[in-house]
From Swiss-Prot:
Glycans are attached at N58. Residues 2-103 form the Phytocyanin domain. It comes from Cucurbita pepo. Disulfide bonds join C57-C91. InterPro entries: BlueCu_1_BS (IPR028871), Cupredoxin (IPR008972), Mavicyanin (IPR041845), Phytocyanin-like (IPR039391), Phytocyanin_dom (IPR003245). This is Mavicyanin. The keyword S-adenosyl-L-methionine does not apply. The lineage of its organism: Eukaryota, Viridiplantae, Streptophyta, Embryophyta, Tracheophyta.
Length: 108
C-alpha cells in the first residue's frame, strides 16, 4: 500500500500557490492506500466533505475533521473523496483536493 503525501514536499498550505487537482491527477489511489496531510495546525485543518460542500467550499458540516498537523487518512473503499481546509477563505484559495480511489488494491 502507498502513502500519498498530499502536496508532496509543499504539504497542505496556502502560503504558496499549489495545484492540488494536478497533484491528485498525477497520483493513482487504491483501496488500502492512505493520504498524509502535513500542515501547521495553528493555521490549517483537514475536513472531509461531500461533493456539493467541496464545490461551494462549505465547511459547516464535514463528515470528518482532522486537526493533528500530520493526519494519516486510510482509503478504505473505492469512490471519490473530497477534502478541504475549513479555515475561512482557504478553500477559496485552492486548499482543497478531490481523491478518486480505484477499486483494486495497489500492487505494492
Amino acid at each position: 500500500a502507498t502513502v500519498h503525501k498530499v502536496g508532496d514536499s509543499t504539504g497542505w498550505t496556502t502560503l504558496v500557490p499549489y495545484d492540488y487537482a494536478k497533484w491528485a491527477s498525477s497520483n493513482k489511489f487504491h483501496v488500502g492506500d492512505s493520504l498524509l496531510f502535513n500542515y501547521n495546525n495553528k493555521f490549517h485543518n483537514v475536513l472531509q466533505v461531500d461533493q456539493e460542500q467541496f464545490k461551494s467550499c462549505n465547511s459547516s458540516s464535514p463528515a470528518a475533521s482532522y486537526t493533528s498537523g500530520a493526519d494519516s487518512i486510510p482509503l478504505k473503499r473505492p469512490g471519490t473523496f473530497y477534502f478541504l481546509c475549513g479555515i475561512p477563505g482557504h478553500c477559496q484559495l485552492g486548499q482543497k483536493v478531490e481523491i478518486k480511489v480505484d477499486p483494486g488494491s495497489s500492487s505494492a
